[in-house]
Curated annotation (Swiss-Prot):
It catalyses: Exonucleolytic cleavage in either 5'- to 3'- or 3'- to 5'-direction to yield nucleoside 5'-phosphates. One of its GO terms (biological process) is DNA catabolic process. This is Exodeoxyribonuclease 7 large subunit. One of its GO terms (molecular function) is nucleic acid binding. The gene is xseA. Heterooligomer composed of large and small subunits. Keywords: Cytoplasm, Exonuclease, Hydrolase, Nuclease. It comes from the Bacteria. Bidirectionally degrades single-stranded DNA into large acid-insoluble oligonucleotides, which are then degraded further into small acid-soluble oligonucleotides. It holds the Pfam family Exonuc_VII_L. Its EC number is 3.1.11.6. It comes from Vibrio cholerae serotype O1 (strain ATCC 39541 / Classical Ogawa 395 / O395). GO terms for cellular component: cytoplasm; exodeoxyribonuclease VII complex.
Length: 446
């Protein structure tokens, strides 16, 4: 080998596939994918193999039984699904594939997946960090409200402010809080409030609703506008159980619009409100901490999964499944070939078997017997027809026919036919034959 080749890093195919697999698994991490199921297979091993596709591309997928046991529906070919997966490579064939960790029907899952993706992205950028959150003013001079002019949230906020601090100035920045244009309008209203700088604190929110109804508060443009605001912002979206991206980015999260009004107004229960504020901050800090811990745990879990013997066992099990399938196909092909040979030999043996010859001769004999019977039947029919013709002719010349017309035949007792009177003499006995019998008579004279 030349020195130039000796200095090169030359890979074997196995090493190349192994390093590509490690590169995909280590660098890409977790991905979310939506597509249509095809070629779904569930062998006896309990693992699932399928293809995810769209109108232009497809990718092979594997979901091991440890994960697919958590799927609460039976996947079907043609079904649209949302999956959480990690990229990998099936080394024996060099096939790029993805390993599925979770699966759910597309629809509700798509919004939740978008929520989680944006949440992780903004958390990684530090937009949820407690250190960047601005404190609320102790005695605000003016409160800005960013919500729908006709919604129940505005009514609730104004009602609380009027009850607690009727002299507190309020500026309303009306905006849509639902629909495709709502996110842009909310961001514009926040920007307008910062430009005018007439308020010490802003309440951004609306009443409760479904995930789709509240989705404008999960838009990236709203989150980044809240983060960039120089005026402290209280997020007051929906009910206490409703959580949005705006809640994580805002300086303070209030469980309801009414609670937000409580936070910005002061009365004799100031200490109680301050306690609520600290509780809200503590809850926000804990959510942020838990979000960070969850993200860290996911990263550590991913690293552990890659190094765990179970991952190697799953790859080997996948290879075993494929080999089992190939073996089964080969055995079926071999059995089919042997069956064809057996059928041909059986046919040849049957053709030369004495039993076959006997059967053939018996069949020929039956055919001959049938032909003879048919010939006999035809002969009998012809004979009966000829007999009928001869009978008609015989009847035409028979004496009996003359007797039937009223004639008679006379004989002597010796049987001699009497044709003339000279053949008899008085005293002779004659026998006269009629159609229905005989008459004996005696000649008296002639």
């Amino acid at each position: 080998m030349s020195s130039s080749l000796a200095n090169r890093n030359i890979y074997t195919v196995s090493r190349l596939n192994s390093e590509v697999r490690l590169l995909l698994e280590n660098e890409m991490g977790i991905v979310w994918l939506v597509g249509e199921i095809s070629n779904f297979s569930a062998p006896v091993s309990g693992h699932w193999y399928l293809t995810l596709k769209d109108s232009q591309a497809q990718v092979k997928c594997a979901m091991f039984k440890g994960n697919n046991r958590l799927v609460n529906f039976k996947p079907q070919n043609g079904q649209q699904v949302l999956v959480k997966a990690r990229l990998s490579l099936y080394e024996p064939r060099g096939d790029y594939q993805i390993i599925l960790e979770s699966m759910q029907p597309e629809g509700d899952g798509r919004l939740q997946q978008q929520f989680e993706q944006l949440k992780m992205q903004l958390a990684a950028e530090g937009l949820f960090a407690q250190t960047r959150k601005k404190p609320l003013p102790e005695n605000p001079r003016c409160v800005g409200i960013i919500t729908s002019r006709t919604g129940a949230a505005l009514h609730d906020i104004l009602h609380v402010l009027k009850r607690r601090d009727p002299n507190l100035p309020v500026v309303i920045y009306p905006t849509l809080v639902q629909g495709e244009e709502a996110a842009i309008q909310i961001a514009q209203a926040i920007g307008r409030a910062n430009t005018r700088a007439e308020c010490d604190v802003l309440i951004v929110g609306r009443g409760g609703g479904s995930l789709e109804d509240l989705w404008c508060f999960n838009h990236e443009i709203v989150a980044r506008t809240i983060a960039a605001s120089e005026i402290p912002i209280i997020s007051a979206v929906g009910h206490e159980i409703d959580v949005t991206i705006a809640d994580f980015v805002a300086d303070v999260r209030a469980p309801t619009p009414s609670a937000a009004a409580e936070l910005v107004s002061r009365d004799h229960r100031h200490k109680q409100q301050a306690l609520h504020q600290w509780q809200a901050k503590l809850a926000s800090t804990m959510r942020h901490y838990l979000a960070q811990q969850e993200t860290q745990f996911a990263r550590l879990q991913h690293k552990l999964d890659k190094q765990h013997p179970q991952a190697r066992l799953e790859r080997q099990q996948q290879q075993l499944d494929e080999l089992s399938l190939r073996l089964e196909q080969k055995m079926q092909q071999r059995l089919a070939t042997q069956q064809q040979r057996w059928d041909r030999l059986s046919h040849k043996i049957e053709l030369h078997s004495p039993i076959h010859l006997i059967r053939q001769q018996r069949f020929n004999l039956i055919q001959q017997e049938q032909r003879i019977n048919q010939s006999i039947q035809r002969y009998l029919i012809q004979s009966r027809h000829q007999l009928a013709l001869l009978s008609e002719k015989l009847d035409a010349v028979s004496p009996l026919a003359a007797l039937a017309r009223g004639y008679s035949v006379t004989r002597t007792t010796q049987g001699e036919l009497v044709r003339q009177s000279a053949q008899v003499k008085p005293g002779d006995t004659l026998v006269t034959q009629l159609m229905d019998g005989e008459i004996l008579s005696t000649v008296n004279s002639r």
